Amino acid sequence: MSAFNLSAIAFILAAIGLVVFMLVVPRLLGGRSHGSQKEEIFEAGVVGSGNARIRLSAKFYLVAIFFVIFDLEALYLYAYAVSVREAGWLGFAAAAIFITILIIGLVYELSLGAMNWAPADKLRKKARLYAAPAGFSLADITKFDGVDELMVDPTGKIPAQSSGQINVSNNIETNRRHLQNIDHINTTGNVTSVDFATSAQTDKMTR
């Protein structure tokens, strides 16, 4: 038996012995614990949180194209790099054309947003309104009609103008009847139903 065969056999036996040592010795010397905490999953020494199955927006076809551009061309350029003197200017021209085509492909992918890995909905940012639109007037939305203007209401009631909390229910008809009876919301936020037309007639009669 040659020395090469002996060294190969020794290497194989040493590898098998190392594996057996690493599997058997810890089980003999290490302690064993049982319980619910034993079944918990650890991530880098801490208790894991959240779901491990996260859906990522991986554009695999773009990854494959980038692999062609950044990895496979190195394989072809390596052959030129080790034979630059033998290839001469003809080899340089061929390598330059090859690299130019790859650069054009890279620029095309960048124009398509291939390097942008964020989800599309996060990229679209709403434009901030720096100026009010044409015809906008703050006085129009803060206008408070006077009592004289409200008295000409066909119902004879003054609508609720002040701010206040109004409790509503899931029944649309109930809300509609409730809103029809609302005439005024006083400063305390309490809703009062007053027929101001009738009150005005009563005041005239008393006068």
Curated annotation (Swiss-Prot):
Its main location: membrane. It is a multi-pass membrane protein. Its EC number is 7.1.1.-. It catalyses: a quinone + NADH + 5 H(+)(in) = a quinol + NAD(+) + 4 H(+)(out). The keyword Translocase applies. Keywords: Cell inner membrane, Cell membrane, Membrane, NAD, Quinone, Translocase, Transmembrane, Transmembrane helix, Transport, Ubiquinone. It is found in: Cell inner membrane. One of its GO terms (molecular function) is NADH:ubiquinone reductase (non-electrogenic) activity. One of its GO terms (cellular component) is NADH dehydrogenase complex. The chain crosses the membrane at residues 6-26, 62-82, 87-107. It comes from the Bacteria. NDH-1 is composed of 14 different subunits. Subunits NuoA, H, J, K, L, M, N constitute the membrane sector of the complex. PANTHER family: NADH-QUINONE OXIDOREDUCTASE SUBUNIT A, NADH-UBIQUINONE OXIDOREDUCTASE CHAIN 3. NDH-1 shuttles electrons from NADH, via FMN and iron-sulfur (Fe-S) centers, to quinones in the respiratory chain. The immediate electron acceptor for the enzyme in this species is believed to be ubiquinone. Couples the redox reaction to proton translocation (for every two electrons transferred, four hydrogen ions are translocated across the cytoplasmic membrane), and thus conserves the redox energy in a proton gradient. HAMAP family: NDH1_NuoA. This is NADH-quinone oxidoreductase subunit A. The gene is nuoA.
